[in-house]
UniProtKB/Swiss-Prot annotation:
Gene behind the chain: nnr
Residues at which (6S)-NADPHX 2 binds: G330, D442
The species this protein was found in: Thermosynechococcus vestitus (strain NIES-2133 / IAM M-273 / BP-1)
Cofactor: K(+)
Function according to Swiss-Prot or TrEMBL: Bifunctional enzyme that catalyzes the epimerization of the S- and R-forms of NAD(P)HX and the dehydration of the S-form of NAD(P)HX at the expense of ADP, which is converted to AMP. This allows the repair of both epimers of NAD(P)HX, a damaged form of NAD(P)H that is a result of enzymatic or heat-dependent hydration.
Name this protein carries in UniProt: Bifunctional NAD(P)H-hydrate repair enzyme Nnr
Lineage: Bacteria, Bacillati, Cyanobacteriota, Cyanophyceae, Acaryochloridales
Residues covered by region (NADPHX 1): 63-67, 128-134
Gene3D superfamilies (UniProt xref): 3.40.1190.20, YjeF N-terminal domain
Length: 505
């Protein structure tokens, strides 16, 4: 089954989508009421009145403020002690109606933001998507003060003060612990630099017709947010009469005297994918180590340089017989001939770590279709120096790099981005800084390599990224962010998959 992912939109695209719905007959008040109800249901579920009885709602002058006022009203009806702060004289008509009704119900409005200091949770509805001007003066000062308070802050759609396309801070912005994004993901929420203000992103759908989305985005490159649909990308269905040679053959190449553990981590991760045959090519001196830890693999010892890197691949190793080759973990920059040989192989490739650094010196562009590059931003800058600083932000840069190189480019980071050669983009909104340690990328390379040996490149890429991140999140729950070392991460791969599949039944 082909996964379907929620779209990521710009401000102009979201305005076109909402405009089409309104032109089709949906009353604006009806949409505001629906959105407010869904927001209040989320808040009641995650901030119950037993633990968070006192709620502050910051209401702006526009429809984001109207949504906030509906939330305030609904929480008030459900027994929460609500205080409203709306520091604006001029309101949009619909927002003014909701403010008037809130006063009629007796909800208390406070004049000064300091009056909110004793609440248990803060709901930010000052500004939504489309804000362009910088926040200054007393409003900016109030936001800065709110950011110093210890209570959890929940923003409606976009943290107030954050640009919804670029993720830039417009003077100042609410530092949200959670952002409840309405309808479709806004591009700016997924920019890596915006994450300290976005916190945990949660999509709150409000039933946008798929035909409206398709029409509005028909001429634009597609941008998607990964979600649980990624589990459908894994090669879980097998014929009852299959055999190992029909389940993919993966060649892993890497390791050195300096980085002996990297290729071992990749191999341990790769075998979790169920790949039929796993062959690992390492320096001769590492062969016994890898074989002792991965006895089900065929381990090929390679001639070494004096410093313990692979000098060349051995004669008789037929690269064309493999379904996929993953090259790079622990390789070292000495292995130029290895990468040059791999690039001539007529099979699917994953290139990581020093294979990328060597690739930057070889410049064999464009790459064979379906090649997967997995750089972090430092490696990306070495690979594509002409794009850095000239092609917009990182999301624009990764799209430009994929188009130029003819590869799938996976830019690792707090919000890992995947771009295809046709210019489509996928972003993983869920990850953890617990992965910021040596070896995490080696695990990802093994995962993607094992999946690539069994299926097409794009599915292998986003399936591997999602699986890797979800296993890390689960490991973090048990071991804290300090305990998600690579072997712990690998140990959680199959239990995470099993629980995800059980939840789908």
């Amino acid at each position: 089954m082909k996964p379907t992912f929620p779209a990521i939109v710009t401000t102009a695209e979201m305005q076109a989508i909402e405009g089409a719905m309104f032109n089709g007959g949906l009353p604006i008040p009806a949409l505001m009421e629906k959105v407010g109800q869904r927001l209040s249901h989320y808040l009641q579920a995650h901030f119950p009145t037993s633990q968070y009885p006192r709620v502050a709602v910051l209401a702006g002058p526009g429809h984001n403020g109207g949504d906030a006022l509906v939330v305030a009203r609904e929480l008030w009806h459900r027994g929460y002690q609500v205080k409203l702060w709306q520091p604006f004289e001029r309101l949009k008509p619909l927002t003014a109606d909701h403010a008037r009704y809130a006063r009629f119900l007796g909800l208390p409005f406070v004049e000064r933001v300091e009056a909110l200091q004793e609440v248990d949770v803060i709901v930010d509805g000052l500004f939504g998507f489309g804000l362009e001007r910088e926040l200054t003066g007393e409003l900016a000062h109030a936001i800065d003060e709110i950011n110093t308070w210890p209570q959890p802050r929940v923003s409606i759609d976009v943290p107030s003060g954050l640009h919804s396309d670029t993720g830039a801070v417009l003077g100042t912005a609410i530092r949200a612990d959670r952002t409840l994004c309405l309808g479709l993901w806004k591009r700016g929420l997924l920019v890596e630099e915006a994450q300290p203000w976005v916190g945990q992103g949660v999509l709150i759908p409000f039933d946008i017709p798929s035909v409206v989305i398709e029409t509005a985005l028909a001429s634009a490159p597609r941008r998607y947010c990964l979600d649980d649909s990624c589990w459908q990308a894994l090669p879980l269905s097998r014929s009852p009469i299959t055999h190992k040679y029909q389940q993919g053959q993966l060649l892993l190449i890497g390791g050195s005297g300096q980085f002996g553990g990297s290729i071992l981590l990749s191999a341990l991760a790769a075998r979790c994918t169920g790949v039929g045959m796993l062959v690992v090519a390492v320096p001769q001196s590492l062969k016994s180590l890898v074989l002792s830890r991965v006895p089900d693999a065929i381990v090929v010892g390679c001639p070494e340089t004096p410093r313990g890197a692979i000098a060349r691949l051995p004669e008789g190793l037929e690269l064309g017989k493999f379904s996929a080759i993953a090259c790079g973990p622990g390789l070292t920059p000495e292995a130029v001939s290895v990468v040059a040989t791999v690039l001539r192989a007529e099979t699917s490739l994953v290139l990581d770590a020093d294979a990328l650094n060597i690739l930057a010196t070889l410049s064999p562009w464009p790459l064979p279709s379906g090649t997967i590059l997995t750089p972090h931003y430092g490696e990306f800058r070495r690979l594509f120096p002409d794009l850095v600083g000239t092609a917009g932000d990182r999301l624009d840069q990764v799209i430009a790099a994929a188009r130029w190189s003819n590869a799938i480019v996976l830019l690792k980071g707090a919000r890992t981005a995947i771009a295809s050669a046709r210019g489509d983009l996928w972003i993983n909104p869920h990850s953890t800084p617990a992965l910021a340690r040596g070896g995490s990328g080696d695990v990802l390379t093994g995962l993607i390599g094992g999946l690539l040996a069994q299926q097409e490149a794009l599915r292998a890429t986003y399936g591997g990224v999602w699986w890797h991140a979800q296993a890390a999140l689960e490991a973090e729950q048990q071991a804290t962010s300090l305990g998600v070392y690579p072997e712990q991460l690998i140990a959680h791969l199959l239990p995470t998959l099993r629980r995800a599949l059980a939840a789908r039944v």
